[in-house]
Amino acid sequence: MQGSARNFLKPKLVESSQTGVNEFKVILEPLERGFGHTLGNALRRTLLSSMTGSAVTEVAIDGVMHEFSTIEGVQEDVLDILLNLKEVSVMLNTAETAQVVIEKKGPCEITVADIEANGIDITAFNPDKVIATINDESHMRMTLKISTGIGYDTATSRTDEASSIGGMQLDASFSPIRRVSFTVDAARVKQKVNLDKLNITIETNGSVNAEVAIKRAAIILQEQLSSFVELELVEEEEALPTSEDFDPQLLAAVDELELTVRSANCLKAEQIYYIGDLIQKSEQDLLRTPNLGRKSLNEIKEVLTEKGLNLATSIENWPPVDLMSE
C-alpha cells in the first residue's frame, strides 16, 4: 500500500502571476485524474475560511454614543463610517490586538493613511480608502481597535467583551482572501494522458500573495489530515475505561457549577455536558464559542478554580464508555 502511494504524480508550481490589482493566478500540474477537483475544492474552502488576518473590530468616535447618530460637519452619517471601516485593509505584524487613533481637522477627507500607529507595527494595504469627509473646519477624532483573527466574526458574538465608552462593535472579516475560484484542465506527461492541471485564481486584500496563501492552506490541510495517516485500530479485547476509572468530580454535569444561564446555555450548545468535557477546553476554544465572551470565560475559570480545576487539562481516555452511552 505504501509503495503504491509513492507512484502517484506530485504536482509542481508551473506558473504564478499577478493578473490584476491584488489578483493572482497559480497553476499546478500534473495531478492524477480527479485530484484537480479534490484538491481544488479543499484548497478553496480552506483559503476562504481559515486564513489569519486583521480587521477593525471596534470604534469610538468622540461625541458619538451610537451608530444611528450624525456628526455635525461630516458628510457621512455614522452608519456609513462604520461600513467604510469594515473595508479597511490592515495587518498587525506583531500584536494580536492594538488601538490606533485618527484625528483630523477639516475640511478634508479622512483616509486609512491617516491612522496614527504610535509605534505599533501595522501595515495598511488600502491607504487611499476614504473613511469620512469633513466639510467644514470641524474636528474629528476616532479610536480604532484592530484585532487579529480567522474567518468572519460578527459583532453580536462579542457582546460580553468590555467596550470602551461609546465603543461600537463591528462585524469583522479577518480573512485576507476576498475571492477564490479554480478550473481543471487536461494535462499530459509523456505517454500518460487524462491527467489534471489545476488553475487557481485568488483575489486578496493585498496583505498576502497567492503562493504564501496556498502554502498556508496546504499546511492547515496537512495538519488536519495527519490524524488519518496515524489511524490505529483499537484492539477488540482492549478494556475501555468506565466511570469508575475517573475522579467523580469530572463526571458531574456542568449544571452543578451553577453558572449563569447564558454561560450554561453556551456550553450546552457546544455539547459540553460534563465537567470533564469542560476542563479539556482551552480559553481560546471557549472564546470561539458563539455568544460566550470574556466575562463568561472569567466566570467559568473562577468556578473551576474553587474546585481545584483548570482549563486546558488533558484527561487520558476521556470520556468513559458508560458515560458516552448515557
From Swiss-Prot:
The keyword Transferase applies. GO terms for cellular component: cytoplasm; DNA-directed RNA polymerase complex. GO terms for molecular function: DNA binding; DNA-directed RNA polymerase activity; protein dimerization activity. Its EC number is 2.7.7.6. One of its GO terms (biological process) is DNA-templated transcription. It catalyses: RNA(n) + a ribonucleoside 5'-triphosphate = RNA(n+1) + diphosphate. The keyword Coiled coil does not apply. Residues 246-326 are annotated as: Alpha C-terminal domain (alpha-CTD). InterPro entries: DNA-dir_RNA_pol_insert, DNA-dir_RNA_pol_RpoA/D/Rpb3, DNA-dir_RpoA, RBP11-like, RNAP_asu_C, RNApol_insert_sf. Pfam families: RNA_pol_A_bac, RNA_pol_A_CTD, RNA_pol_L. It is an enzyme of class 2 (transferase). Residues 1-232 are annotated as: Alpha N-terminal domain (alpha-NTD). Keywords: DNA-directed RNA polymerase, Nucleotidyltransferase, Transcription, Transferase. The N-terminal domain is essential for RNAP assembly and basal transcription, whereas the C-terminal domain is involved in interaction with transcriptional regulators and with upstream promoter elements. Belongs to the RNA polymerase alpha chain family. DNA-dependent RNA polymerase catalyzes the transcription of DNA into RNA using the four ribonucleoside triphosphates as substrates. Homodimer. The RNAP catalytic core consists of 2 alpha, 1 beta, 1 beta' and 1 omega subunit. When a sigma factor is associated with the core the holoenzyme is formed, which can initiate transcription. This is DNA-directed RNA polymerase subunit alpha. It comes from Ruthia magnifica subsp. Calyptogena magnifica. The lineage of its organism: Bacteria, Pseudomonadati, Pseudomonadota, Gammaproteobacteria, Candidatus Pseudothioglobaceae.
